[in-house]
Amino acid sequence: MSRKVLFVATVLRMHVLVFHLPYMRWFQEQGYEVHLCCANDTPDPHPQVPYCDRWVELPFSRSPFSAANREVFRRLKQLIDAEDYALIHCNTPVGGLLGRLAARAARKRGTRVVYTAHGFHFFTGAPLKNWLLYYPAERLLSRWTDLLITINGEDYARAKRFAAGRVALVSGVGVDLARFRGPVDRAAVRAGLGIGPEDAVLITVGEHSERKNHETVIAAAAPIEGAHVLFCGVGDRQAALEKQARELDMEDRVHFLGFRKDIPALLAASDVFVFPSLQEGLPVAQMEAMAAGLPCVVSDVRGNNDLIAPGEGGFLRAPRDVSGFTQDIARLLADPALRARMGERNRREMRRYSLEAVLAQMTALYRGLLDGREP
């Protein structure tokens, strides 16, 4: 086999640049040539991708039913058949679908195929249509998977019943804890946002989408006098969220900050992390908040509840339990000692999810596949 590896994912900015650079760098350090296939979701028509020797831009669609994906599959298979990769690591549902189908012939020639499930679309409480569509597909695709990586307990238990060569549970994608250790001038960060040093500040990070359920954050904060809410992210539901804030007379307390590169500073300037999402895999946003020492009030869904338990690091509520979220947020805001105690617990917990810890897990798995042995 050649000393080449291929990473496959749907998009560059929102996936590859966030999750995969440390692993691409590791392969380069081991002497491998690193190739990448994904769509360009950046504003730059010719972005520079670190630790990448060859980037093949393919217009992946997130919808598995999109006609555009037929051409993506053709070009992806053509590339895989031509390059003789030692290992192909597929990510995202569509990347995992097309990548594994395109690599079937390559597997017969010795290429190892890895798929990371960043959160199956079928899960406890998922709509029936998700189970009817995604469960059979993932079960079938596991036949052409040498290593299926899961990142939460529920997915791991389910995937062990599939036909993949091996199923592993790793601690997410890794959090760079060093980013959350530096000193931050809380007052200065707050002043830049028009928020006073003694005001209560709630923060959430993520795309403005139906899945993130940001409406619950605004509704839960509304009864808490003087509480500010920071939204870090972009998305097509922002206009609806702005309308909700106006209707609740909260437009001066809800701050839409857009896509931010200073998340560690914003977390350090906040008091409570609030995250009522409907579906997660193992949320980086929550892990980063925990690394920053924040207590968390989050929805009791897969992934979120892998990271905290009730009263341990925060509180869990049903995703749309607005009054429950309000109650838990108010309790934390009224008790600085409780916030500090839970925040310190979360800092300690994140050592298991550090970039160093996960990189060690992943490289052991990679080595095991490439050396032809069980890691």
Language-model regions, residue ranges each:
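N-terminal strand-loop element at the rim of the active site
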Residues: L6-A68, E154-K160
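A conserved mid-protein helix/loop that constitutes part of the nucleotide-sugar donor-binding site
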Residues: L17-P22, A200-P223, D236-E242, S323
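Donor nucleotide-sugar binding/catalytic pocket of nucleotide-sugar-dependent glycosyltransferases
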Residues: V56-E57, R139-R186
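A short helix/loop element that forms part of the nucleotide-sugar donor recognition site in Leloir-type
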Residues: R75, R181-I195, L338
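Aromatic "clamp/platform" in nucleotide-sugar-dependent glycosyltransferases that forms part
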Residues: F259, L278
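Short hydrophobic beta-strand element within catalytic cores of glycosyltransferases
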Residues: P295-V298, I308
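Conserved acidic donor-binding segment of nucleotide-sugar-dependent glycosyltransferases
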Residues: A309-G311, F315-V322, R331-P336
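A short, well-ordered alpha-helix in the C-terminal region of glycosyltransferases
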Residues: G324, R331, L338-R352, Q361-A364, ...
